[in-house]
Design a protein with these regions (language model features):
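Conserved N-terminal phosphate-binding loop of PLP-dependent enzymes in the Aspartate aminotransferase
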Residues: 1-409
Length: 409
């Protein structure tokens, strides 16, 4: 049920903002009855503008990795804010952060910073083209790399020319990738691939060792650049980079979401051989040297390493996954859980239009758990046992409601 304050804000927004909001957080993309506007957050919980509190399993769609308003992160941000944020050049923290990131990410010899994931993936593509002098970029069908004209999933406002040098392949299919490489011929600049397959409304897939090895080998054979888009998964799965457990080192990686625990920042890391090309491309923005977000990122990365946050999140996510599996079996509902436990996706068998997913999420929301019916969710390090148990207390009757809907047709 949409609260009165939220409803009033939607009406006001509709008068002054096209569509009421832009992008993936607009109300039309949410289940009916979901709040659009929020007042604040603390730890693993958020409060909407009507004062209702939820255990948050979206974590601001990924940026919250330690928990909302994490004390160490906010203290670092406030200390830098007292000195200044946007100055005539970057603060000392820029170098501190770059050194920390290079020391953490396995393949990294250098780092550059931006504001959003799209900034980072676009910079990676530009660096690859500058380094190779070539144009073609291979992308997986259905993958999301941002909202710039070359990669946005919605074609409004773009032209065919924006994508004329992209060639598609199928994720986790080495043969499809090899065919795309052959199609690019001598004009292959880069292969860009998400750390895992996390397309909207389909089961997630971790990259297979065979696929990752093929991407690495084919890039090397053709003198092309292998880019891992780690914007969504970075620092949740592995602090060294999400493909480190596979033994694969990309040439470039793009990071954003979890890097600064909700403060606006993105990063590109790269190997030594691309340093010169990276220095030649012109990428910049009015707020790209903002010192406050960099101070927050430095504190975030240190805390992630101190507590081994990926393991903490994996444990919480597995507790949730195991509990949901038991509940779904008891309810007699076909629930598919996919992806790493830190980034769970829940889909129902036969639910092509996601009506069961929307019903499930509405019922859980009414009981204090904020989930999503077709987008992967995100765990953070603040999700303790009590929070996961609270989610499971909400999902059990929600699954029962799904079972009733199935029986009633």
């Amino acid at each position: 049920m949409i609260g009165p304050h939220d409803r009033a804000l939607r009406e006001r927004a509709a008068r002054v903002i096209p569509g009421g909001l832009w992008g993936h957080q607009r109300a039309a993309s949410l289940p009916e009855g979901y709040p659009q506007f929020f007042r604040g957050g603390e730890g693993c919980r958020v409060e909407d503008v009507d004062g209702r509190t939820y255990v948050d399993l979206m974590c601001s769609w990924g940026p919250i990795v330690l928990g909302h308003r994490h004390p160490a992160v906010e203290a670092a941000a406030q200390a830098q804010r007292a000195l200044g944020d946007c100055l005539d050049g970057p603060g000392e923290v820029l170098v501190d952060l770059a050194e920390t990131l290079v020391g953490m990410v396995e393949h990294a010899d250098w780092a550059m910073f931006q504001k959003n994931g799209t900034d980072a993936t676009t910079a990676c593509v530009m660096i690859a083209r500058a380094a190779t002098g070539r144009r073609k970029v291979l992308v997986a069908r259905g993958s999301y790399h941002g909202s710039a004209p070359w990669c946005t999933p919605v074609p409004a406002g773009t032209t065919d020319a924006d994508r004329q040098h992209l060639i598609a392949f199928d994720y986790n299919d080495p043969d499809s990738l090899a065919a795309a490489v052959a199609q690019a011929g001598d004009d292959l600049a880069a292969i860009i691939v998400t750390a895992l397959r996390h397309d909207l409304a389909r089961d997630q897939e971790l990259a297979t060792p065979a696929f990752a090895q093929a991407a690495r080998a084919l890039s090397a054979e053709r003198g092309a650049v292998l880019i891992v888009d780690d914007v969504r998964a970075g620092f949740r799965l592995d602090l060294r980079g999400s493909w480190a457990p596979l033994g694969i080192e990309p040439d470039l990686s793009a990071f954003s979401k979890a890097i600064a625990n909700g403060h606006a920042l993105a990063a590109v890391t790269g190997r030594e051989g691309l340093r010169e090309a990276a220095s030649r491309v012109f990428v910049t923005g009015s707020f790209w040297c903002s010192a406050v977000s960099m101070a927050a990122a430095l504190a975030t990365l240190r805390e992630l390493r101190r507590i081994d946050a990926p393991a903490v999140m994996a444990g919480a996510g597995q507790r949730l996954r195991d509990g949901l599996a038991v509940q779904a079996t008891h309810a007699g509902v076909g629930l598919r859980q996919s992806g790493p436990p830190q980034m769970p996706l829940l889909l129902f068998e036969g639910d092509v239009e996601h009506r069961l997913g929307a019903l499930f999420c509405r019922e859980a929301l009414a009981r204090g758990a904020y989930l999503h019916p077709k987008h992967n969710m995100f765990l953070c390090a603040a999700h303790d046992d009590a929070a996961i148990d609270a989610v499971l207390a909400a999902t059990e009757p929600a699954l029962a409601a799904v079972a009733r809907a199935l029986r009633e047709g």
